[in-house]
Amino acid sequence: EFRRVLFRSEMYMVRYADDFVCLFQYENEAQRFYQLLIERLRKFGLEIAEDKSRILPFGRYKGTKESFDFLGFTHYNATSHWGKYCVLHRTSRKKLKMKREAVKKWLWEHMHESIADTIEALNVKLTGHYRYYGIYGNYIGLQKYYKYVRQELWKSKRRRDQTYWLTWKKYMNILKIHPLEYPRIYLKSAY
């Protein structure tokens, strides 16, 4: 009802928990909604985080290089392989940094386990990462994360004995026997 009375053009809202993105066809309607949202939240003693909210021109006809972060992804305008407009998604820098720090900490905490056990547990973590972030347009990001994990695993296992017996060549031979989960795209459509 609220939408029909105040807004005449297309409007969409994507919401997850306490995060949401509102999409408007016209900028003036987005600005009006933003003001109404601030007033509405004020009635309940809440306020909007000014540093996390903004109105930005985005879409097929705007031709901007603007991007925004939502749910761990950076969303940006692009063209598909066929030259058609699409919105592509890549892992946001902030989330990627957090994931890297977490996996590095985990590897150092588990450096004294056997390499086979570590890889088995690590593959579960990698699969979860790929299933969430494995969408069309983000394959390079998945590869970078895979290479980072592979490198950190090698460093942690080398550090374990402090004799550095585990050369890169030996390590790659171990990975042939106990392979790390390789990146995979799970959602292939570009929308």
Predicted regions and their residues:
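Non-catalytic terminal/accessory segments
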Residues: 3-191
